Amino acid sequence: MQHNVLILDFGSQYTQLIARRVRELNIFCEIFPYNHIPSDLSSYKAVILGGSPFSVRGEDAPHPDLSQIRGKMPLLAVCYGAQYLAHFSGGEVAASNTREYGRANLSYIKEGETFFEGVSENSQVWMSHSDSIKALPTNAVKLASTHDVEYAAYKIEGETTYAIQYHPEVYHSTDGKKMLENFLVKIAEVPQNFTPNAFVDEMVAELKEKLGNDKVVLGLSGGVDSTVAAVLLNKAIGQNLYCIFVNNGLLRKNEFQNVLDQYKGMGLNVKGVDAGDRFLGELAGISDPETKRKTIGRVFIEVFDDESHLLEDVKWLAQGTIYPDVIESVSVKGPSATIKSHHNVGGLPDYMKLKIVEPLRMLFKDEVRRVGATLGIDPELLGRHPFPGPGLSIRILGDITPEKVQILQDVDSVFIEGLKSWGLYDKVWQAGAILLPVNSVGVMGDERTYEKVVALRAVESTDGMTADWVHLPYDFLMKVSNDIINKVKGVNRVVYDISSKPPATIEWE
């Protein structure tokens, strides 16, 4: 994957979005913290400086060393990057009279500029800054303005350096992707050769060379990431890949056997381990959400360790790590504060001494799905909604019992099958049911009931970082609510969660 684009991260919430837009142009890019610029820049064809919550005037402002970049390769500075270049090149940056946040329009665009080829007149852009450039460096030329921002875009004479005070990566910037394409393809001449087919060919060759005849073990979850990783590894090393699919007793209804059969039908060397009783036994009496997660993580490691020891001469542990996980681990400020323990289980015992292989570590989730399609994986598997590693345990509020698991599996099954039959499943990013720790009074026939309450949750999102609740049709909600109450013994009330993230999280625990 040569001819990369290097994106320097200054802590902006939009940095990953820049990378996604660049990847959409079939151009490979990588994100690095501004203070960890690679020493060898020979494989990079262009550099993008991202935005930042900091002010260039602040004492704690990021100050990257751009001596190996400025004037030596094409450079695009976005928002904070544009202000940084202006500030340290002799221009003036000052606090704006009002915070410039939201939509704006380019009222002036300099004619004949390649950067703005194909960009519509009065094009809408997205602003997000509290400082503004008041004067350009003497060697800079204004390229664009808005009503409130005179220097919305500029370039440095004698360099292939461009700077913009808005965010082209945000969807609200209607021609933003076109501007990125103009800079990367027409100005920087970066090849557009990063495609799913190219990735598969290159990664399979890399895995063959790295792994040789070594044996590799991989824990399958039934999710998209581990499934695509397994098929990719299987294509490279065949039966030297040993897959372990553990049933923790907290999967969806009939999921363990159904997914196991699918894996075997795909030709994977997979072993199913039904450890449901062991997990539920360890979870008995535990109500605290974090303790549940850690207990499930610990027991999974124990089960995986037991099964791995039955294999001889395994040297590698494969994981379905994807790029957002990698970026988070080396971010400007380090990993975010722990809101919840991460679903992905790590921390295998040191004595296992396995080397790690992560074939998907440079891909975003949507790219993983496209690679999966290229590999011929069943669209039903690729289109599965995200499902938490701890399974239904964090959708059962309070302690966990086999009876509660059974109820929630049945409710979830009615909900998910209903979404599919109404043609709604693929329009929803994630959906599921939550068993609440309360009973409610009801009437069935002439009998008074006092039974469980369940909540239904359906959200739309692109990456899970933010999410909006889905406005499911009232007729559907009425039908699925009636079906749940009539078909699932022990439930007499259904509610629908209309909270967005933030402030709520997608899962209740």
UniProtKB/Swiss-Prot annotation:
Please give the pathway this protein is involved in. Answer: Purine metabolism; GMP biosynthesis; GMP from XMP (L-Gln route): step 1/1
Report domain GMPS ATP-PPase positions. 194-384
Q: Does the keyword Nucleotide-binding apply?
A: yes
Q: Can you name a GO cellular component term? A: cytosol
* Reaction equation(s) it catalyzes: XMP + L-glutamine + ATP + H2O = GMP + L-glutamate + AMP + diphosphate + 2 H(+)
Q: Supply the InterPro entries for this chain.
A: Class_I_gatase-like, GATASE, GMP_synth_C, GMP_synth_GATase, GMP_synthase, GMPS_ATP_PPase_dom, NAD/GMP_synthase, Rossmann-like_a/b/a_fold
Q: Which residues bind ATP?
A: 221-227
Please list the GO terms describing molecular function. Answer: ATP binding; GMP synthase activity
Q: What class of enzyme is it?
A: ligase
Q: Which residues form a coiled coil?
A: none
Keyword Nucleotide-binding on entry: yes
- In this chain the Glutamine amidotransferase type-1 domain maps to 4-193
Active site per database record: 79, 167, 169
Instruction: Could you list this entry's UniProt keywords, alphabetically sorted.
Output: ATP-binding, Glutamine amidotransferase, GMP biosynthesis, Ligase, Nucleotide-binding, Purine biosynthesis
Q: Which HAMAP family match?
A: GMP_synthase (MF_00344)
What role is this protein assigned? Catalyzes the synthesis of GMP from XMP.
The entry describes its oligomerization and partners as: Homodimer.
What PANTHER family does the database record attribute to this sequence?
A: GMP SYNTHASE [GLUTAMINE-HYDROLYZING], GMP SYNTHASE-RELATED
Q: What is this protein called?
A: GMP synthase [glutamine-hydrolyzing]
Gene assigned in the entry:
guaA
